């Protein structure tokens, strides 16, 4: 039988079969690939991380085979979840399987399974419904403010949602602001492969440039994208390398690029420490403000009589925004008293200005014992995350063009000291 040399290597996989085999080419020693993978998962768990595997099952794959494969990786390797690809997968059977009941399942559509299986919250919707509204707002392509709001506050009572602006099926986050068009010529398909609808913007020059004002704007938009993802409800997801601005030179379908195009350039990480530090600080802010990851959907009212609605929206006037998605700016106020963690109950106000001009938004008060502190400012090129937050006066907040600012409502130091003295005195 003749053998045929393939012109290129699809190193992503996505082929039928081999559902019980470790990919030996990822191992240091191919003969010990299974042992190495188990050691990797143990090490991840020791550091508080999880391992989620991605599987592609073509339509028509035997249901029993799918369930057996998933159980195998959970029982033999202790993986923590699966991102499943393929049409008409048996999601009800997967959701009801007791051996997978503590395993995170990511899929595009759970159908009836998402409503029926309320006994455990391990089902997550993973699709691009967040990606496109976010890109449209950032780069001004048929944007819709109402659609953006829906995505930022989206949270299910049963299903979880994964939010991303970039993933492996498209531009990296940095390339989203460097290229108007895909550049997949190296894939050998006449640049016809990959997503043609990217809603990207190069801001004046296609690809890298030495023009400082363009590079500053691109970095600001990168910071805005990070903030949008991290300030949204649901599960934030970043494509590996996006945390420090990794580029694939405009290739948005690097399935066959087992080379510097498809690799992450870790050397460039050292020259982009400011971006990585910004992401780390924003991630920490999200962890310290659990109201940004509320386990239940918001009601948009003060149903517990805590002093303010759980989530409210603000435009030029407090408690009001422009109707019908006609604007490019709004403020979202999260009431910290509705946080599930009593130790972290600061209010959070996220002010968005996606327009190319300065905008003023209303800034509601936070009571007599609290003040607003500016914590994050995407327009600040040097210190976008403030180590020493600035006090902001109530009434309104001015936003430069293409800017997101995040404020925290905290107790004023004098009141905090009085409370601590009262506790010590038993008052």
Whereabouts are the PLM-identified features?
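Short, solvent-exposed loop/turn and secondary-structure capping segments
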Residues: 2-5, 175-178, 249-251, 361
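Short loop/turn motifs at secondary-structure junctions
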Residues: 15, 77-78, 234, 398
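Active-site neighborhood of glycoside hydrolase catalytic domains
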Residues: 36, 43-49, 56-114
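Conserved alpha/beta catalytic core and glycan-binding cleft of carbohydrate-active enzymes
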Residues: 91-245, 253-257, 290-297, 303-310, ...
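Carbohydrate-interacting/catalytic domains
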Residues: 215-219, 223, 228-238, 242-427
